[in-house]
A protein has these predicted regions:
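Secretory-pathway/membrane protein signature
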Residues: 1-148
């Protein structure tokens, strides 16, 4: 397969989207031009283009990310370096958080230990960073996080 990105609206108005044009019980249904907010669509298209361009020029994600730290007070991540990456960033977040709340630039290395960050309390990942600062997606340790 190929890496892919899906850009979507999560708060859809189902009377105006995914409907055949009709009036039912006094409600007008359907995708019609009067419901399009062109200023918003233009801003969203510009934002999407910038984000996708940044993703396209970013280096590939690190490969073979591994984690160690069971029954230790610190957590160590290791990975294979990627051609085109100038450095790497280690990310972690509480297991209840949907976003990467913490990260640390770790340089052009292939492993890093987060001192006094216990493996049991967080999710961890690593991203590759290009010379210009563009960054790959974060990769979780283990086979499930691999793009290979």
């Amino acid at each position: 397969g190929f890496p892919a990105v899906r850009i979507m609206e999560t708060n859809e108005n189902y009377t105006q989207q995914h409907q055949d044009i009709r009036i039912e019980d006094g409600i007008a249904y359907g995708d019609t031009i009067e419901h399009v907010n062109f200023d918003y669509a233009a801003k969203l298209t510009s934002l999407n283009a910038v984000v996708l361009a940044g993703m396209a020029k970013a280096p590939a994600p690190p490969a073979n990310v591994e984690i160690r730290g069971a029954v230790r007070p610190s957590t160590t991540l290791s990975w294979d370096k990627i051609l085109g990456a100038a450095s790497y960033r280690v990310h972690w977040r509480l297991t209840t958080s949907p976003t990467w709340d913490y990260s640390r630039a770790v340089g052009d290395v292939d492993s890093f230990t987060l001192e006094n960050v216990v493996i049991d309390n967080y999710f961890f990942g690593v991203s590759s960073v290009a010379e210009d600062g563009s960054q790959s997606p974060v990769v979780f340790p283990g086979p499930a996080g691999s793009f290979d």
